[in-house]
């Protein structure tokens, strides 16, 4: 709508030719993509190891007793990772199937999913890696690498991991 209303000025970055074609959203140079990343589930490796648990391999598992009260997600209305995860659940479960994304979210709610307004609060307050009580969090695929690179004390591997489930990882 904003493009149609003509509210943007044109600007062509000098290095636009280095941007992948999939991210060129406007060939009139009114809008330029500046950032992207994959959103998926992350897990606290130490917590799961101590509990003798393996990360879930399907979204359906998140509604089972093993994962009750163990997932924190971001609100889709206030957080882009939360919206990305919601969209991925629509892609995964569909909209009009016998069991669709609305059924999944109802089951997540019944399984004590915690919904926070933003990523920082979910990750740094409720994720077990930072003292919370939820070993699963919706985050970025780059979060484990960031945990490794920016660790206050040197580590030999990331303390968190990605849960890469087909159709449950979203490029934003």
Tell me the role of every PLM-derived stretch:
Residues 1-8, 24-54, 82-92, 170-172:
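Periplasmic solute-binding protein
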Residues 1-7, 16-26, 125-126, 144-152:
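Pocket-flanking alpha-helical
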Residues 4, 64, 110:
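Phosphate-coordinating loops and pocket residues in cytosolic domains that bind phosphorylated ligands
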Residues 9, 24-26, 32-35, 64-66, ...:
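Extracellular/periplasmic catalytic domains that process cell-envelope and extracellular macromolecules
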Residues 9-43, 60, 69-76, 163:
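A structural signal for short loop-to-beta-strand junctions that line the ligand-binding cleft
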Residues 53-58, 101:
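Short, charged, surface-exposed loops that flank catalytic or proteolytic processing sites
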Residues 60-80, 88-93:
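Short loop->beta-strand "edge-of-pocket" segments that line small-molecule binding or catalytic clefts
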Residues 81-165:
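Ligand-binding pocket segment of bilobal, Venus flytrap-like solute-binding proteins
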């Amino acid at each position: 709508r904003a493009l149609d209303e003509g509210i943007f000025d044109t600007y062509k970055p000098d290095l636009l030719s280095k941007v992948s074609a999939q991210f060129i959203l406007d060939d009139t140079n009114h809008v330029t993509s500046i950032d992207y990343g994959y959103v998926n589930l992350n897990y606290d490796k130490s917590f799961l190891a101590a509990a003798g648990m393996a990360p879930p391999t399907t979204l359906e598992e998140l509604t089972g007793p093993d994962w009750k009260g163990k997932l924190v997600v971001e609100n889709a209305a206030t957080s882009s990772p939360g919206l990305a995860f919601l969209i991925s659940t629509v892609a995964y479960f569909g909209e009009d199937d016998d069991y669709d994304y609305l059924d999944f979210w109802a089951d997540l709610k019944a399984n004590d999913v915690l919904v926070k307004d933003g990523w920082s609060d979910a990750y740094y307050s409720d994720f077990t890696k930072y003292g919370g009580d939820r070993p699963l969090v919706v985050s970025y695929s780059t979060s484990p690498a960031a945990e490794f690179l920016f660790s206050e004390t040197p580590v030999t591997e990331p303390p968190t991991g990605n849960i890469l489930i087909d159709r449950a990882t979203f490029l934003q």
